[in-house]
Amino acid sequence: MLNTVAIIGRPNVGKSTLFNKLTKSRSAIVSNFSGLTKDRNYGLLSIGDSKTFLIDTGGIDSSKKESIENEISEQAWIAVDESSLVLFVIDGSEELTNLDSEILDNLRKRNKKFI
């Protein structure tokens, strides 16, 4: 069984760009507009003989009350539950936001290993 790594974070922090770079693909749509990734997207990271499944997710945003945003967030948390490790992506050009802190707290409560 291969290890599985979920890539999560708030909307538009570069999750899909990172996923495409690591999987050497263009399977994740990348744009300046948030909300394009709606479901989990699976890919394979290969380094030498080592292989790992990666899961690209939509942005987690608990401040949005619309059902589609709730579904996107739920899909991201399902990916976290499926994974053995989480890559928590933040925007390094900005201060840590309340939403970033909320996601971090939720990761800690789930007792998941994360980077």
Q: How does the language model describe each region?
A:
Residues 47, 71-115:
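Conserved C-terminal guanine-recognition region of P-loop GTPase G domains, centered on the G4
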Residues 1-69, 73-80:
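Conserved G1/Walker A P-loop phosphate-binding module
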